[in-house]
C-alpha cells in the first residue's frame, strides 16, 4: 500500500518542534476532511440512506452468521486454560466387543470406522487407576431428560452426572457453595447432592442467596443443593442448545435411574464420556499411545471379548471446546453460508462503488477547482476515502446493532415452533473485531475506485464547458469493470440460490416412508423411581395413550422412544442373527456382529405412522408382556442380515435380548433425510425394560394449538407431576 505510506509520510519534518506542529496540522486536516464529508453526505440524504441501508444489511447479515459460527466453531469452554483439555475417543470396526451404546456421541467416519465418544464404567476405573501420562481422568454423562421438581413446580430438564474429580480438573469454582467432590462420588446412592446452573438458580429460585441447603427432586429422588455454577460455565459442551441445569455425582446414576439388570455398569456397555488435562512434560502422541495400551488391557480385563471380536482403539482430541460431536454436521453448511454472506457483502460494495463513481463524475468540476486552488492529489484521494470510510462506519454501526439484535436468529430458525430450547449466542470480542474489520475493509473496497478516479482529474479539461461528457467517457472503463464484477457476483449468487432451492426441493420430495401430515409429537417422561417394574411403566404408557385416544379429534395414538426423522436419534446396538455364533466359531472373519438401529414402539405404531407391513404381521393383542418378545424389521435389515432368506420366524439378538421376527415393514428414513435407510428393528415396548422418556405420536387433523390444552389436561388427570414437553409436529 505505497499510496497509504505516502499519504502520511510526505513532507515529514525532521526537528521535534516541527514534528509537533506537523502532527497538529495533520489532525486538523483529518478533522476538516471528516467535517466536510459529513456536510457532503448530508446534502445527499437519499444516496446516504441507500448506501448505509445496503451496508447495514450486508454487514448485519455477516455479523449474525459469524456470531453463530463463532459460537459453534471457536468459543472455548468457560474454564481456566481450556487448551490443556483433551477429549477421549474410541475407534472401532463392525467387530468391536460392545453390547450396548448409551448415548449419541457415535458416528461413522469417512474411512468406514465407528467413532465413539463413550466408554464402559469398569474400563474407566481401571484406566484412571493406571494413568501416568495425563492429569486425573474425569468422567461425565448426560442421560435422557428427567423430571425436576423445584420450588413446588415440576418441569422437564437436563442433568449431568459427573465424577468426583470433575470440578477439580475443570478448575471451576461455584459462585455459591461448594462443588461436587470425591467424597460425594464414593458410595452408590450416597451423594444426594447437586450443583445447579446459574440460569436454573435465577429462574426457579429468583437468585436468592439462601438457595444452598434447599432440596429439589430429580425423578422424585431428593437431592440437596450445595453449589451454584458460574454464569459462564455450561458444562463440558461449549455450544450446546440445552446445557445441563443440574449436576449430580456419578454415584447417583443408578438411584435416579434404577437399573435392576445392571446394564448401566456392564463392562461391554459404552456409557461415559471422558476428558483430562494434558501434562506439560508429556506430548499428546506419547499420552495417546500409553493410554491406548492401558485401555486395551483394562477393557480385556473387565469386559467379555469373544473370538473374532476386537477392542476399540483409544485416541485423544483437542478438548478446548469440549464435546463437539454435536456440531460435526454443521461445519460444511456453516462454511457455505459464510462464503455466501461474504459474496453478498462484496456485491453491496460493488453497488455502492458504482454509486460513488457516478457521484465522482458529477463532482469532477468541484475536484478540479480544489486542485486548481492548491489541493494535491493525495489530499483529494484522502477526502474521497474519508467519505467512503464515514459511510462504511455508519453502515457498520447499524450492522453491528442489527447483528447483535439478530444473533439468536439462526438457532431460532433451526428449532420448531413448539420447542423451547435454544442456543444463547454470545457476542464477544471476536464478533466485534470481525465487524470492525469488515467495516474498514468495506470502506476501502468500495471507496478506492472513486477516490482514485477523483484524484486523477485533469484540471484544464474538467473546467472547460462540456467536460462532463468527456469525463464520463474516461471513467467508462472503471464503471464497466464494476458492473461486470456485479454481474459475475450476482450470477454466482443466483446459481448458489438455485442449487440451494433444488436441494430443498429434493429433500422435500424425499419419501420418508410414512405419512408426515397431521402428526403431533410430544414427550412424556415418567419417573423411573416411582415405577418399580417394567409392567408399571407399560401400564402408565397405555393409560396415557388411551387418555389421548379419547380426546375429540384424535384419530390414532402410539408412542416410541424417539420419533422417526429425529436428528438426535442414534439408537444402535450389536445385531446377531440366529446361528451367527456358530458361523463365527467356524470362521471368525466371516460374520462377527454388526450394528443395527432399533426403536421401542407401542401398539398401533405402524398404522398411526402409515408404514405398510410388507410381509408377516404387525403387533397384535397376543403380544403381551409375558409372550415371546417380537420385532418387526425393515427391508434394509433383511437385505443386510437375511439375504435371499425369509426372515419371518427367525430370531436375533439385539437391543435388550433375543426377539422373534414377526413382520417386515417398508423402509423409512431413520434420523437423516439425506442418508440411505439403515437396518432397523422395531421392538414392542411393553415387552422391553426401557424406563425412560417416550415420544407420543398423535394423528389428528386439528391444529396443534387447539389440541395441546386437552392433551395437558389428560396427562394431569393421570398424574399431576407427570411432565409433558417438547411439543412439535412431524413436519
List each language-model region with its residue ranges.
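N-terminal membrane-entry
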Residues: 326-343, 430-434
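Alpha-helical transmembrane segments of integral membrane proteins
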Residues: 7, 11-49, 319-326, 355-382, ...
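Conserved beta-strand->loop/alpha-helix structural units within folded catalytic cores of enzymes
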Residues: 43-58, 62-65, 215-218, 278, ...
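Mid-to-C-terminal secondary-structure elements
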Residues: 95-97, 145, 158-183, 190-332, ...
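Membrane-proximal extracellular/periplasmic loop immediately following the first transmembrane helix
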Residues: 77-144, 268-273, 511-577
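Short, strongly hydrophobic transmembrane alpha-helices
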Residues: 45-72, 76, 81, 347-349, ...
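A short glycine-centered flexible hinge/capping loop motif at secondary-structure junctions
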Residues: 58-60, 372-376, 395, 399, ...
Amino acid at each position: 500500500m505505497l499510496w497509504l505510506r505516502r499519504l502520511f509520510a510526505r513532507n515529514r519534518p525532521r526537528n521535534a518542534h516541527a514534528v509537533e506542529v506537523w502532527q497538529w496540522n495533520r489532525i486538523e486536516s483529518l478533522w476538516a476532511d471528516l467535517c466536510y464529508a459529513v456536510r457532503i453526505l448530508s446534502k445527499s440524504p437519499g444516496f446516504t440512506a441507500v448506501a448505509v441501508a445496503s451496508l447495514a444489511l450486508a454487514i448485519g447479515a455477516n455479523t449474525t452468521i459469524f456470531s453463530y459460527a463463532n459460537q459453534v466453531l471457536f468459543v472455548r469452554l468457560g474454564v481456566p486454560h481450556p487448551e490443556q483439555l483433551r477429549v477421549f475417543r474410541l475407534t472401532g470396526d463392525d467387530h468391536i466387543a460392545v453390547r450396548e451404546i448409551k448415548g449419541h456421541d457415535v458416528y461413522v467416519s469417512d474411512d468406514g470406522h465407528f467413532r465413539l465418544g463413550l466408554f464402559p464404567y469398569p474400563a474407566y476405573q481401571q484406566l484412571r487407576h493406571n494413568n501416568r501420562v495425563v492429569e486425573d481422568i474425569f468422567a461425565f454423562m448426560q442421560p435422557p431428560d428427567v423430571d425436576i421438581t423445584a420450588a413446588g413446580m415440576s418441569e422437564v430438564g437436563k442433568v449431568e452426572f459427573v465424577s468426583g474429580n470433575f470440578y477439580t480438573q475443570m478448575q471451576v469454582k461455584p459462585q455459591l457453595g461448594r462443588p461436587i467432590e470425591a467424597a460425594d462420588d464414593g458410595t452408590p446412592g450416597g451423594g444426594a447432592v447437586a450443583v445447579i446452573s446459574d440460569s436454573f438458580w435465577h429462574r426457579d429460585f429468583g437468585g436468592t442467596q439462601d438457595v444452598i441447603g434447599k432440596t429439589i427432586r430429580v425423578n422424585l429422588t431428593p437431592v440437596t443443593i450445595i453449589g451454584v455454577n458460574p454464569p459462564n460455565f455450561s458444562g463440558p459442551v461449549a455450544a450446546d442448545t440445552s446445557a445441563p441445569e443440574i449436576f449430580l455425582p456419578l454415584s447417583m446414576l443408578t438411584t435416579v435411574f434404577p437399573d435392576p439388570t445392571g446394564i448401566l455398569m456392564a463392562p461391554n456397555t459404552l456409557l461415559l464420556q471422558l476428558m483430562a488435562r494434558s501434562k506439560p512434560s508429556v506430548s499428546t502422541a506419547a499420552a495417546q499411545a500409553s493410554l491406548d495400551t492401558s485401555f486395551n488391557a483394562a477393557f480385556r480385563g473387565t469386559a467379555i471379548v469373544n473370538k473374532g471380536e476386537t477392542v476399540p482403539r483409544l485416541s485423544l482430541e483437542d478438548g478446548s471446546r469440549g464435546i463437539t460431536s454435536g456440531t460435526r454436521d454443521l461445519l460444511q453448511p456453516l462454511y457455505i453460508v459464510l462464503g455466501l454472506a461474504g459474496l453478498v457483502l462484496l456485491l453491496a460494495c460493488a453497488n455502492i462503488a458504482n454509486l460513488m463513481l457516478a457521484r465522482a463524475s458529477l463532482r469532477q468540476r468541484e475536484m478540479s477547482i480544489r486542485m486548481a486552488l492548491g489541493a494535491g492529489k493525495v489530499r483529494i484521494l484522502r477526502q474521497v476515502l474519508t467519505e467512503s470510510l464515514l459511510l462504511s462506519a455508519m453502515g457498520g454501526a447499524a450492522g453491528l446493532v442489527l447483528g447483535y439484535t439478530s444473533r439468536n436468529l439462526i438457532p431460532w430458525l433451526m428449532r420448531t415452533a413448539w420447542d423451547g430450547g435454544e442456543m444463547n449466542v454470545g457476542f464477544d470480542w471476536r464478533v466485534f473485531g470481525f465487524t470492525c474489520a469488515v467495516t474498514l475493509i468495506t470502506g476501502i473496497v468500495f471507496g478506492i475506485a472513486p477516490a482514485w478516479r477523483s484524484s486523477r482529474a485533469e484540471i484544464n479539461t474538467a473546467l472547460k464547458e462540456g467536460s462532463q461528457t468527456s469525463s464520463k467517457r474516461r471513467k467508462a472503463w472503471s464503471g464497466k469493470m464494476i458492473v461486470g464484477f456485479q454481474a459475475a457476483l450476482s450470477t454466482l449468487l443466483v446459481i448458489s440460490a438455485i442449487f440451494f432451492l433444488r436441494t430443498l426441493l429434493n429433500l422435500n420430495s424425499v419419501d420418508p416412508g410414512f405419512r408426515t401430515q397431521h402428526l403431533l409429537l410430544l414427550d412424556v417422561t415418567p419417573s423411573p423411581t416411582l415405577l418399580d417394574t417394567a409392567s408399571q411403566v407399560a401400564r402408565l404408557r397405555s393409560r396415557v395413550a388411551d387418555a389421548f385416544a379419547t380426546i375429540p379429534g384424535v384419530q390414532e395414538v402410539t408412542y416410541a422412544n424417539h420419533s422417526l426423522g429425529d436428528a438426535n436419534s442414534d439408537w444402535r446396538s450389536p445385531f446377531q442373527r440366529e446361528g451367527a455364533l456358530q458361523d463365527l466359531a467356524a470362521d471368525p472373519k466371516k460374520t462377527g456382529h454388526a450394528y443395527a438401529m432399533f426403536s421401542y414402539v407401542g401398539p398401533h405404531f405402524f398404522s398411526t405412522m402409515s408404514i405398510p407391513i410388507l410381509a408377516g404381521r404387525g403387533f397384535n393383542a397376543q403380544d403381551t408382556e409375558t409372550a415371546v418378545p417380537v420385532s418387526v424389521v425393515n427391508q434394509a435389515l433383511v437385505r443386510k442380515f437375511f439375504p435371499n432368506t425369509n426372515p419371518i420366524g427367525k430370531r436375533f439378538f439385539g437391543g435388550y435380548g433375543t426377539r422373534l421376527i414377526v413382520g417386515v415393514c417398508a423402509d423409512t428414513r431413520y434420523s437423516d433425510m439425506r442418508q440411505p435407510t439403515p437396518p432397523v428393528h422395531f421392538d414392542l415396548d411393553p415387552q422391553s425394560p426401557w424406563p425412560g422418556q417416550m415420544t407420543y405420536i398423535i394423528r389428528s387433523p386439528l391444529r396443534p394449538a387447539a389440541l395441546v390444552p386437552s392433551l395437558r389436561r389428560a396427562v394431569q388427570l393421570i398424574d399431576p407431576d407427570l411432565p409433558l414437553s417438547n411439543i412439535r409436529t412431524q413436519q
